[in-house]
Amino acid sequence: MDLSSVFGLIQTALELGLICSVTVLALYLSYSMLNVCDLSTDGCFTLGAVTGAVTAMAGHPILAIFAAMAAGLLSGLIVSVLQTRMGINSLLAGIIVNTALYSINIAIMGGASLLSLNKTQTVFSLMKSALAGTPLAGQYKLLTALAAAALIVLFLTLFLRTRMGLAIRATGNNPDMVRSSSINPAITTTVGLCIAGSFTALSGCLLAQYQKAADINIGQGMVTIALASLLIGSTVLGRGGIFLRAVGAVIGAVIFRLVYTVALRLDMPAFMLKLVSAVIVVLAISVPYLKTQLPVIRRRMQRKAD
């Protein structure tokens, strides 16, 4: 493999990592801040992809982004209503919505399982036209993905410091304290899940426009990928402020995609990639714990040696 091919693989991994990092940031909000494990991520990601694809095929690539985010917001709203108004466990609520979204996504696609955007204008082609004749013309995909990730990081950094953002963080830490402060945790949970759903759908929309196709399985395994990326980011940068943790989520997504790309280049069978994802998740979860246990193991070994 020559050097240009290596750089091409790295750039593709960066682009895909930045696009998927938007989903990781959504999981950061719902899982890390709200302490809610939303298993509707896969279906919501596909919802954003197919909604954005259908809207872009109608000739509105920019409107496709907002349509996808609106669809994701509705998905998050339904998940939160099932949890807060109907007393359904968060895990079960996510599974129910994820199951329902499969039928909804097929309906949006008009009964098809694949939508092609080969002859459709996308936000990436718009960026390419905007940068035509500039030194950055060849990096239009990377710049578009970077802009999306940067905007979401900036939004979360500012939003989580507002009154509502602080209430969302408090809800995840101690719901009883939030109730005693005359704040309805159902409202904060709903707001948080709606925002997370819109981010997940945005990520799906961007990926569909990036690869110029949307299929019914585009979001399969996305919750696993996002969780692994989130844990990798927290391992790399550790625990810090909101901005640092959000940046860590983005870095984790890029690292995961790089590892995934290497696995593909090693001619690994496609059916083994899910196993690779599972192994990465296990390592991302266990490494922080093993770090804390390492001094204990060393002390035990020293005692045995003595």
Features from the language model and the residues they span:
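Membrane-interface helix caps of multi-pass small-molecule transporters
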Residues: 29, 54, 77, 81-86, ...
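Alpha-helical transmembrane segments within multi-pass membrane transporters and channels
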Residues: 60-99, 104, 252, 256
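Transmembrane alpha-helical segments in multi-pass inner-membrane proteins
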Residues: 200, 204-275
